[in-house]
Design a protein with these regions (language model features):
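Short internal beta-strands
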Residues: 36-43
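Small-residue-rich beta-alpha loop regions that form the catalytic core of phosphotransfer
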Residues: 19, 44-46, 53-98
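N-terminal donor/sugar-recognition subdomains of glycan-related enzymes
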Residues: 1-2, 27
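Alpha-helical scaffold elements within enzyme catalytic domains, especially in hydrolases
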Residues: 29-30, 81
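Generic N-terminal amphipathic, Lys/Arg-enriched alpha-helix
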Residues: 2-16
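Glycine- and acidic-residue-enriched helix-capping/strand-helix junction motifs
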Residues: 17-25
Length: 98
């Protein structure tokens, strides 16, 4: 990734995470207000009733940055899809420890 501004962001969220709706409800509008194009995977789009969604691999190919809200399993699933495209991942732990 170069020093250019991040403009395309993929967002993935753990399904059924209790805090997901609140976090996504604040994060997605904020990113859009910053003039970022936000890509949501199908599960994440369903959580907040968005109609537009993409496959993990498609998001990984197009995004400048991936944001993952969830636990280890969610992060590992996204990392597997993103690995061939060398896209940075910002992980936010919503899982439990242990």
């Amino acid at each position: 990734m170069s020093n250019e501004r991040v403009k395309k962001i993929g967002v993935f969220c753990k399904p059924k995470a209790p805090s997901a709706i609140d976090i996504l409800g604040r994060l997605i509008p904020w990113l859009r207000k910053q003039n970022c194009h936000v890509f949501l995977d199908t599960g994440t789009a369903d959580i907040i009733n968005e109609t537009s969604s993409y496959e993990k691999r498609e998001i990984s190919q197009q995004a400048d940055l991936l944001i993952v809200l969830g636990g280890d399993g969610t992060l590992l699933g996204v990392a597997r899809s993103a690995h061939p495209y060398n896209v940075p991942i910002l992980a936010v732990n919503l899982g439990s420890l242990g």
